[in-house]
């Protein structure tokens, strides 16, 4: 698996990897991460992938991170 690009964002690290005919987009925020796999035969290029990973997509990821953080925090009784 190798890093092929990054998407700039002020609140999270977004890294695009390539491995076995798949693009893997990893979002990282604090102690949590989310990863999404896209088949290279469907997406065709990193440029097309970046069109998919738009602000609306990133906003849904951010909402999920908020839910994950609440669950993480609850696990420690905070």
Where are these regions (language model features)?
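N-terminal acidic leader/helix
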Residues: 1-34
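Short amphipathic beta-strand/extended segments with alternating polar/hydrophobic composition
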Residues: 33-41
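Mixed-charge, Lys/Arg-enriched low-complexity segments
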Residues: 42-78
